[in-house]
Structures are given as C-alpha cells and as structure tokens.
Amino acid sequence: MQMEVTLNSSRKKIREITGYTFEDEKQSTESWVTRAQSFKAAATVLSQSDISEVQYAYFYNAAISLELILKAVALFKGKGIPKTHKLQDLARTLDLPFSIEQLDTLELLSEIIIWSGRYPVPNKDSHWDNYHDVVQNKHIIRDGNITRACPKRFPTLENVSNIWDICYREVGGKSA
C-alpha cells in the first residue's frame, strides 16, 4: 500500500513539473478551446449523416461545443468558468456581438444541454411547458398546415458555426 501511495505521489509530482495539473488545465483557455473543437467536429460529422436518429446527438454536441467555447471566452476575459448551462445568459455577460436570432439559438441549445438532448422529458413539467410553449416556438414558422424551421434561429450547422466563430475569434483564433 505504501508503495502505491509513493507511486501516485510521484505521478502527481511529474504532472506538477510538466504543468499538467488540475488547476493548470482548469485555467487553460487552450484546453477549453480544444475540447470545444472536439465536440464541434463531432457535431459537424453528425450533421452530415443521412441517419435521422442522430439529430439529438448532433444538437447535443453542437450545444456542448458552444458551452465550452463560451466558457473559454469567459476564462480568456478573466471571468473564470461560470457554472451554468444557460448559454444565452453566458453570452450576454461576455458582451459578444450576437444577434437576437443567435441569442435565441443559444436559448434553445441551453434546453438541449439541460435535458432535451439527453432525455425524453425534463425533471420538471414546467421545463417541458416552457420548452414547447416558449423556446421551441421561436424556432419554427407555422404557415397554415405547414411547419418549418426558422432559418435564422434554428441550430443548423451554419448557424452554430457562425456563433462558434464569433467566440473563437474572441480568444484569438481565426475563423474556420
């Protein structure tokens, strides 16, 4: 047992020497951006799939990529890592140049992170009602019997990428 404790202590010392500690990674904008890029790449692949069953996986990966890149911006601006999944609120605190439509997209993606991307129903029926009566209605257009997505608000890959690029430029990256 003593040898195992010593070995773990040695591993921790190596991480400290190489700068790969919990605190270093937590405060590394680059780490947050890299993880955001990974989820964005997954969302891109899923968006190109012909398999309709992957839609929630696409939305979830797109939403998580935006949450991570927004938190990278917060860290870059010296605001720490906010403990929230409310992307619209996070974006507003960062003073990023988002349009009303983009903020609405972030609102929908927040619901996807919190529940609809992972579960068929939320923990509270009030979340269900808010999603279907308020949030989702901003993203659809009804014309008689026809319902379609609002092109400027729906989280298509193009809309998600435009939001992502605003954040990425904020941390010193160049648009993809």
Where are these regions (language model features)?
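A structural signal for well-ordered alpha-helices, especially hydrophobic packing surfaces
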Residues: K40, S47, I69, W164, ...
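Hydrophobic alpha-helical segments of membrane proteins, primarily the transmembrane helices
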Residues: S28, W32, Y58-N61
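Short, hydrophobic, well-ordered secondary-structure elements
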Residues: Q37, V54-L75
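Membrane-helix exit/interface motif
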Residues: T44-S47, A72-K77
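Long, charged low-complexity segments
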Residues: Q2-E30, G78-A176
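Short amphipathic alpha-helical heptad-repeat segments
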Residues: S31-F39
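Helix-loop segments that flank and shape redox-cofactor active sites
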Residues: A41-Y56
